[in-house]
Amino acid sequence: MSITWENKKTDSLVRAVLALKNPGEAKKFLRDLLTVSEIDEFGSRWQAAKMLNQNISYTTIRGKTGLSPRTIARISKWLKKGKGGYRLVINRLNKHHHSSSSKKGLA
């Protein structure tokens, strides 16, 4: 039997995440929802995705995150051929960072 993650429960979770207004709210929500270990694991996976996007080697990523080569390979696969979520957020954050940096120079 195949498990599907797209259902009413996860739709509700996605709406809850979208309701968060700032990093402080997100931290509170994540801490109530997940264990410290789970949050740390997700943080490591996110760091790996960003490093893979910068073409940083698996060895370096493993050293900085502690993730296994298998997990890094999965993240790489999802970054390249997944639903596009990693790429969407990386690009959006990079665009936001660049626009914020250029605005600082105008002040």
Please annotate each region the language model reported:
Residues 25-45:
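Short, Lys/Arg-enriched anionic-surface-contact patches
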Residues 89-107:
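Intrinsically disordered, low-complexity basic tails/linkers immediately adjacent to helix-turn-helix/homeobox/MYB/SANT
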Residues 1-20:
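General nucleic-acid-binding
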Residues 20-24, 36, 55:
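Residues at alpha-helix boundaries and the short loops/turns that link adjacent helices
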Residues 60-65, 72:
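Short alpha-helical "recognition helix" segments of helix-turn-helix
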Residues 76-79:
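DNA major-groove recognition helix of helix-turn-helix
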Residues 42-56:
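Short, amphipathic alpha-helical "recognition" segments used to contact nucleic acids or chromatin
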